[in-house]
Amino acid sequence: MSFLQTLLQSLRDNIAVLEHEVDLHNLGTPQVWDPEASTKFDDPEHLISWQAFEAIEKIRVDVRALDAAVTPNHIKLLEMGLQPARTSALNVAVSLGITDAITDLGGDAKLADLASQLNVNEQKLGRVMRTLAAEYIYQEKQPNVFSNARHSKNLEKEGSAAQFLSLLSNEGLRSSAGLLSHMTDIKTRDSYLATDAPFCSAVAQKGETFFEYISHPENSGVALKVIKGVLPWLNNLPKDIAQRAADGKVKCVVQDYFKDNAAEGDIWYLRGVLREYDDEDAIKILTKVANSMRKTPGSRMVINEIWNSSPFIVSNQNAAPSTLTPIHQSRLPDLANLMTWDTLFFFGGKERSVPELEFILEKAGLRISRFFQFRTITTMVECSLA
């Protein structure tokens, strides 16, 4: 069977699984045009089955393989080089509030009316709309008449998704332009410090870290994106949280990572800690945790992170790539890798692969005892004493 036929058969099999799960759990109808057809399917609060999630993963991988197989290389590479235009178009959409404007204009918006409402050039707006329509974000129902589609419904200007996407597609895109110099400059190429992140040279340009930059009043708009987009739960804190905290049983203990732990416990939880340090310092931190764990028999350490992952290891060139994805790593590995790049752009730090994690754990006298994957790109790794 040819490679294309192998991909086609894999897609048939996984689409059958997905449609069965969608029907079984009443998840709606996956499609691209109707914003309401896939409400449950898209709702992050509605946990889809593992079978559905795994089918989605496999379909995405094989669809991309099919696209790569049938696309001449000069077209494939040209399209990849032009990706920043798509990202910029997305930033225009969320920053101007195109989704809201289409709704305000009755759902089917003439391009001239849309440009007038947004106070932008009609011809340039048309190019933005068609760029995003090609990605199934909006739909052109008639010539120069645009409507929202399934993937644009979460782009309301004040929504947390739009704020987060604006951060990625504006400041994130600008930071990414500094990656090459970050990787080749003798001062920064081996550094994981926040002060050496691409953001500092490409955006801040004053040696300031990301958080120093957004602390200035003139950069409050970026800070707002972080609050509304990255930390949307801050908008929904209970009014009596201060009293609840005062009445709680949680005790905060000041801790220096590089000194003996000031507290004891059954569970040690690390999130965004190890990524801040190179291997030498990360091993020192883990060694301190391991020493504390020895004081409490059966204690564990849990690490919650996104890992640098391999979308597939090509051990068989005739197999569908969806069958070649390693198991113990982040799910949606292509997306996980993009997210680890974005954290490097903004904050520096060393995002690791699971084998790289195992290396520093072993040096500290620890090992992975359990590996928990979620239906997203983050994982929980439970570690115990070796």
Task: List where the protein language model places each region.
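Alpha-helical subdomain
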Residues: M1-M129, E140-Q142, K228-A386
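Residue-level detector of alpha-helix boundaries and kinks
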Residues: Q51, Q83-P84, Q117, F164-L165, ...
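Alpha-helix initiation and N-capping motif
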Residues: V63, H74, A161, S176, ...
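Class I SAM-dependent transferase core
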Residues: T87, Q205-L234, M339
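Extracellular structured ligand-interaction cores
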Residues: A93, E135, S176
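A short, conserved structural fragment
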Residues: A133-V145
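Leucine-rich, amphipathic alpha-helical/linker segments
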Residues: S147-H216
